């Protein structure tokens, strides 16, 4: 926390002039310390024999260094930031040029150092998981990412979540302090009020930006679905319980009878205080629960509900999320009796929208979601539904929407229609000429269509647009190998390693190809 102050200054300095109590408490809160320079915390080595990986954490001259040894190749990076206030743990970020990458090593409060979430399932471990604007939206206040793809970081520093994330821009309020020109979430209507929390504490299976929107376009006081929609997926796999995401509190609370029967009175801030929690959290929570359930603390069941009962430990038990190891999440369903998550009983899965976006983009959002989730989860019927919905969109909506075009390219490539995929890819580039993803899609479409010369030129253009996009480098490497252009292949690998000389995968690839 002190390191964050030293580099960033106080969160909400201008707000503190009139609101010293709130800002002082917020500076100690989890959101007020969402990102910071890394604390000098050294640790033991992380060993993964099955992956032939060893990661070391050290501190040199006050700087945290993460070192990787994989199959005899070593790499080490200075850590630029730590994400998380430390209540659960810290994830770490390195900077390579204009790009940010997640370290494969994280620190967990309960278990210490281990692989970052998801890396335990990967065949190879490296510092190559890019952190983009979508990742950083809920962890930093000033994520200055530029370009259509939101991958290139242009700022000097990343700062913790600030006051404006919940209260909106304070410029007018500072010039003329008034309750009329600042957002107070507690005084908003239910949908706008809940959206303030849902911008980060609602995940679903995926979230999609509406056409023409970026993550920074959301402003407190607006319904979140005007900017982005959250897609829910109910998987009815027999004998398996539904998944819980790490930030699925909003979905769980919506299932709670307490919330449903409160008429909208029970919401996030009923129990949580963004400016900082109380020191006697158990007592505070007991009082909140007993404001509606006082009878359970006395006459109804003195045997089990005494005056000092800890309501949360029984009715909001800890759960282990499926997607992030080593962490715990409180069950926000507020169950009467501890109960597992519902078991499915029938095959199939359905998608739905958490809240409806503007009517004109609803069909589009469902189409892109069905196709995306169907592909990621290997649900062919869901993918087929996405194809059907996409093809039913009016041509104007299809042709002017990069996300829709990207989905259509995927469809055409899978259906072995490279010429049609090329048409969609060229249109996507017209809309977003700086998009490396659009350029890469065209390269793949050209290659599938047999135009290797065109594919080569487009892959080189993709690399120029975004040197961090390893798929482009890899595709071009194998194209040169197919064409037996050994000198061009070697020069390409050297060029990549000139940009990122420590990358394990490309060093291994260079060594393998050199032996052939």
Question: Where is each model-derived feature located?
Answer:
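Canonical positions in the second alpha-helix
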Residues: 393, 427-428, 461-462, 495-496
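Register position in tetratricopeptide repeats
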Residues: 414, 448-449, 482, 512-516
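Helix-start (N-cap) detector for alpha-helical repeat units in TPR-like alpha-solenoids
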Residues: 401-403, 436-437, 470-471, 504-505
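Primarily the internal scaffold of c-type cytochrome electron-transfer domains
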Residues: 13, 21-85, 89-96, 115-120, ...
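Short coil turns that delineate tetratricopeptide repeat
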Residues: 398-399, 433, 467, 501
């Amino acid at each position: 926390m002190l390191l964050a102050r030293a580099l960033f200054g106080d969160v909400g300095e201008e707000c503190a002039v009139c609101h010293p109590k709130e800002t002082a408490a917020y500076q100690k809160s989890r959101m007020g310390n969402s990102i910071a320079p890394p604390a000098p915390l050294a640790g033991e080595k992380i060993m993964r024999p099955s992956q032939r990986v060893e990661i070391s954490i050290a501190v040199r001259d006050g700087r945290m260094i993460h070192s990787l040894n994989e199959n005899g190749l070593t790499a080490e990076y200075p850590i630029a930031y730590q994400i998380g206030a430390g209540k659960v743990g810290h994830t770490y970020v390195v900077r390579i040029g204009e790009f940010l990458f997640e370290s494969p090593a994280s620190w967990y409060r309960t278990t210490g150092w281990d692989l970052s979430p998801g890396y335990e399932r990967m065949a190879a471990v490296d510092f190559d998981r890019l952190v983009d604007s979508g990742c950083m939206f809920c962890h930093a206040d000033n994520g200055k990412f530029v370009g259509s793809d939101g991958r290139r970081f242009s700022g000097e520093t990343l700062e913790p979540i600030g006051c404006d994330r919940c209260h909106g821009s304070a410029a007018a309020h500072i010039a003329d302090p008034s309750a009329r020109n600042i957002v107070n979430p507690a005084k908003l209507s239910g949908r706008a009020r809940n959206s303030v929390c849902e911008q980060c504490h609602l995940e679903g299976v995926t979230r999609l930006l509406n056409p023409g929107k970026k993550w920074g376009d959301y402003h407190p006081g607006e319904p979140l679905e005007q900017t982005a929609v959250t897609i829910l997926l109910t998987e009815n796999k027999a004998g398996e319980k539904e998944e819980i995401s790490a930030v699925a509190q909003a979905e769980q609370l919506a299932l709670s009878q307490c919330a449903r029967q409160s008429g909208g009175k029970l919401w996030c801030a009923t129990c949580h205080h963004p400016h900082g929690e109380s020191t006697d959290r158990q007592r505070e929570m007991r009082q909140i629960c007993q404001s509606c359930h006082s009878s359970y603390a006395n006459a109804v069941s003195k045997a089990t509900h005494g005056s000092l009962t800890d309501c949360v430990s029984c009715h909001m038990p800890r759960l282990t999320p499926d997607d992030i190891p080593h962490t715990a999440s409180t069950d926000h369903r507020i169950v009467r009796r501890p109960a597992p998550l519902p078991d499915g009983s029938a095959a199939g899965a359905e998608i739905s929208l958490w809240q409806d976006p503007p009517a004109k983009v609803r069909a589009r959002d469902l189409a892109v979601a069905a196709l995306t989730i169907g592909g990621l989860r290997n649900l062919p019927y869901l993918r087929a539904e996405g194809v059907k919905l996409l093809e039913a969109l009016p041509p104007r909506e299809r042709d002017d929407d990069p996300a829709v075009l990207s989905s259509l390219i995927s469809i055409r490539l899978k259906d072995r229609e490279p010429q049609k995929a090329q048409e969609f890819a060229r249109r996507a580039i017209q809309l977003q000429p700086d998009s490396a993803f659009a350029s890469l899609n065209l390269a793949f479409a050209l290659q599938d269509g047999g135009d290797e010369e065109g594919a080569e030129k487009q892959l080189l253009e993709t690399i120029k647009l975004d040197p961090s996009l390893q798929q482009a480098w890899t595709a071009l490497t194998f194209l040169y190998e197919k064409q037996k252009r050994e000198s061009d292949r070697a020069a390409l690998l050297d060029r990549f390693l000139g940009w990122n000389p420590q990358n394990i995968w490309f060093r291994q690839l260079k060594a393998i190809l050199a032996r052939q």
